[in-house]
Each structure stands twice: as structure tokens, then as C-alpha cells.
Amino acid sequence: MRTSNYLLSTLKETPNDAEVVSHQLMLRAGMIRKLASGLYTWLPTGLRVLRKVENIVRQEIDNAGAVETLMPVVQPFELWEETGRSEKMGPELLRFTDRHVRPFVLSPTAEEVITSLVRNEVSSYKQLPLNLYQIQTKFRDERRPRFGVMRAREFCMMDAYSFDIDKAGLEKSYQAMHDAYCKAFDRMGLEYRPVLADSGAIGGSGSQEFHVLADSGEDLIAFSTESDYAANIEKAEALAPAVERAEPTQEMTLVDTPNAKTIAELVEQHGLPIEKTVKTLFVKASDEIDAPIIALIVRGDHELNEVKAENLPQVASPLEMASEEEIRELIGAGPGSLGPVGLELPFIVDRSVAVMSDFGAGANIDGKHYFGINWGRDVELGQVEDLRNVVEGDPSPCGKGTLMLKRGIEVGHIFQLGNVYSEAMNCSVLGPDGKNVILEMGCYGIGVSRVVASAIEQNHDKYGIIWPDAIAPFQVAIVPMNMHKSERVKEAAEKLYAELTAMGIEVLFDDRKERPGVMFSDIELIGIPHTIVIGDRSMDEGNFEYKNRRTGEKTPVAMADIVEHVKSQLK
């Protein structure tokens, strides 16, 4: 490809509204342009990368035995009503009506559509297992689109759906897709981790996310220092402390704390160690209990894990914190002065809190706390659960090593759905015994456009993008110095361009009438892995200059050897 025939569209300055590196560089490198909030046009350079990611994903998913299909972006609303997700998805599900006032949605995912297809097309266990996938545009009406294509409203996604006669078949399909994901991300040259995850709005049981490791990642991931265990912060289990609760050494005393409305203020003003304090958080209760709200108690230096809390049967879903007005009406005190002693509402205690002694908590009286609280003596312990986020140094749930935390960007997710959707939509086949069997489903997604941004977050320097070879927009750049003034430079560049392209190598030939500095800056910004510089000075010595984008190393290479040298560098 010649730059004279190409829409390069690079920018010198970083746009003000671009927050993360990938967004900044995708705009500056001419990969995308913003059309509206969360909506982007993919320019030629960006599209080349996107297609390469798509092709790698397609090849590995094909190799796993899945079959490609293509489903409509527009879906009938009634399908979403069948599964009950029409309300669960909330405002992210964009609804509209056609000219006949029939309700539709823009597809954020396709479980309903694929289940409807399979229930109409598959009737016997002999047609199973079956795994269908598509690479298609999706739309989620994000409340706050940000970070460019990382959290856009419209995005490209690979979504696959497996159908099996039993759980053993589902587990086999799930493992095949897990392995396919690993092969795809390995080929892309990404540093990633598959981690245990919560199933969230999709539903089902087993679930893993695939995260590209990057400091800009929105998600926290917990890893064992001595095993392959990894889980996102929502799923990572905080084990019960391996110590017994100490015997009381203090009497419970009521203390005036008028200026201590937070844990930090309590610690600072009264000298109480933060690990000797607890936070009492009130959330809306479910119909499982005869109370409007329920208290969740965690240690003062720990954070409530909202996903773990929401998964408790006594807690309403979605999780909703009780308002100060509701708390005051029931207890007579406000946030900052709440605790378990004398509390006449149900409460659940975190595992770390259950082993505490001589601790401090609100007295359920404004401006007062109890110090020296002990379970059993001053208040009954009751129900104990894992309620908190893990912290670095916690013992790993696998029993090996401790946990360390890193940030990651979720680029893929796999679920063992079971029969959540197939049962709701009556998707069944005749089994070997002639009886109807509800199918076991798996669903699998890769955010193709998000992979592009994630790769940049992991591969860049102050000059621009450093693409892994497999997903670079071009493999090689040819930069001729003053080509329009030197006939021999032009001839050498044209000859090399013809040779490399004839071999199937993707080349960007910078034939612009531009200063060398501008040409070099653009090539580095775009991130092409291998650059060949052709100039009169090096040709006088019988050489071209080869430059590796990742290492920055420059190497003189004999003109006669340049093609073989380039071939040896390509991965």
C-alpha cells in the first residue's frame, strides 16, 4: 500500500477528550474517528488491525469445532420477554418500535436469538453437540461511554453458543472454547490471564474472564503467587482467618464520638487501630426475610464486595444501599454511628469480623460508639459469610501461596449457562430414550474491538504504538529518503516494494513528499514492526537500514540481503 493512495490521517497533538493511552494513540495514529458519544468510524489503519484480530479469532474458534453464522443486530423484543431479560438488562438494552409499532431491540448479545434458532432447527440428540458463533456488531446504550473503543456503545464482538445433551458435554465444549481463547490470545502476542468470574446478568454457573494485563485496566485481578489460581476481585474468595478469636481483655464502654463520622476519623481521633473497627452497611433486603433492610458488617480496613453481597439470598438484587432516611426511621441513628450491639434488624458478619475481639463499632446513637465489643458476651455472632474484597497478601483460596493484585482489561468471557435460557425458551431435543431433554448451553464472547485497544495499552512507548507482529496493520514500512529528488533511491524503493508485496508481505510504502522526520514519526506512531530506510548515504555503502520498532535497534543490511533479512525478522 502506497501512502499516496491511503488515508493515513495521523495527528501530531493528543485530543483533549482522550483519557487512556489506547484512545489517544488510536486517534493520533488515524485508526478511529469519533462520530458521536460511544460511536466510532474505523479508518483504514484501524480496520486492518480489527480484521486481523477477527481472523485469528475466527481461525481458532473454527478449529475448536464451532460453525460460523450471522444473526440480525435488530431483535424482536418478545424474545427478550421470554427469558425475562427485557427488564434485567435495564437501560443498556436499546428499545425501539418500527413503523407498525412492533417493539424491537438492538442486540447487546444473542442468547435469545440463537436459542430460538436451535429450538426450531435441532430436534434430536444425534445433531449434537453443536456450537454456533458469529462476529457481529453489538450495541449497548452505555450511560457513560469512555476510553474510546474500550467502552463504546457500538462494538464488534465474537459471540458463540454451544448446545449439548448433558453437563458432561457442556464441560467438554466449555474446555474446547477455553483452549481456543488461549490459542487466539497467544497468537496475538498478548499477556493475559483467564480468571474465575461471576456470571452476572448472563446467568449460569461456571464462568471465566480473560483479562489483558495493563495498568489502565478497570478490573482488579487476584493471582496466587504459587499456583495458576486467578480470579477477578468480584469472585476471589477471602478465606476465614486461620486464627481463633482471642479472649476479651476489655469491658464494653460507650464513648462520645461527635466528630467521628467515618472510620478514618474514628481511628485518628480516638487512637483505635483500624483493624479493630467495623463498618456496618445497610442494604435493601429480599423477600427471604421479614425485614426491609439488612446489615452487612465488614472490618474497617476492608471493602464490601457488592457481588458477593448481592448473591446472598437475604439481599435484594440488584444491590441497593438503604438511604439515610430509611436507616434513621428504623434505627434512630445515621451512617457513621451504626453497629451490631442492640441492633434489632438481621445482620450478616464477614469472616474477618467473626474472629475479632475488643473491637469498636457504632452504638446506633448519633455521635456515640462502643469500644471493647466482644462476640457472645455483648452481641450474638449469628450468620457469617465472605463479604469482602480480597487484599494483597491474603492466603490464596487454592491453598498455595498468597494473593497479589494486578489490573486487567476484560477482553473475553466464557459461561456454562446450563439450562437457564433453554428451559425458559423450551429448547429441547429427543434424547436416546425418546424423551424430551432440555439442552445444556454455553456462551462465549470476545470483544474484538476491545482487544485492539487492549493490545495498545500493553504495547506502546512515548513515540506511539508497538504492535505485535500478528495484528500489526502492516508488517513492513519502506521509508525512502528524498525519493522525489533521488532517482536511484526511488528505483530501489520501488523494486523492494514490488519484491516484498509479491511475496505476500504487507508493506506500507511511504511515497509522500514529506520531510524524513515527519515520515519517521508517522511510521513509529502507527507502530509498524519493521522499517526499511533507503537513502543515498547508506546506498553509497551498499546498504539499507533496518529498524526494529520494538527494540529500536538499527541495523545496516546489504542491499542484496534485505529481503532475506526481512523474512527472517517476520514472526
Curated annotation (Swiss-Prot):
InterPro entries: aa-tRNA-synt_IIb, aa-tRNA-synth_II, aa-tRNA-synth_II/BPL/LPL, Anticodon-bd, Anticodon-bd_dom_sf, Pro-tRNA-ligase_IIa, Pro-tRNA-synth_IIa_bac-type, Pro-tRNA-Synthase_IIa_type1
Keyword Protein biosynthesis found: yes
Record bears the keyword Signal: no
Family label: Belongs to the class-II aminoacyl-tRNA synthetase family. ProS type 1 subfamily.
EC number: 6.1.1.15
Main location: cytoplasm
Gene: proS
GO terms under cellular component: cytosol
Catalyses which reaction(s): tRNA(Pro) + L-proline + ATP = L-prolyl-tRNA(Pro) + AMP + diphosphate
GO terms for biological process, alphabetical: prolyl-tRNA aminoacylation
Source organism: Vibrio parahaemolyticus serotype O3:K6 (strain RIMD 2210633)
Pfam families: HGTP_anticodon, tRNA-synt_2b, tRNA_edit
Gene Ontology molecular-function annotations: aminoacyl-tRNA deacylase activity; ATP binding; proline-tRNA ligase activity
Alphabetically ordered keywords of this record: Aminoacyl-tRNA synthetase, ATP-binding, Cytoplasm, Ligase, Nucleotide-binding, Protein biosynthesis
Phylogenetic classification of the source organism: Bacteria, Pseudomonadati, Pseudomonadota, Gammaproteobacteria, Vibrionales
Physiological role: Catalyzes the attachment of proline to tRNA(Pro) in a two-step reaction: proline is first activated by ATP to form Pro-AMP and then transferred to the acceptor end of tRNA(Pro). As ProRS can inadvertently accommodate and process non-cognate amino acids such as alanine and cysteine, to avoid such errors it has two additional distinct editing activities against alanine. One activity is designated as 'pretransfer' editing and involves the tRNA(Pro)-independent hydrolysis of activated Ala-AMP.
HAMAP family: Pro_tRNA_synth_type1
Protein name: Proline--tRNA ligase
Top-tier EC class: ligase
Localisation per UniProt entry: Cytoplasm
UniProt domain comment: Consists of three domains: the N-terminal catalytic domain, the editing domain and the C-terminal anticodon-binding domain.
Superkingdom assignment: Bacteria
Oligomeric form and interacting partners: Homodimer.
Segments traversing the membrane: none
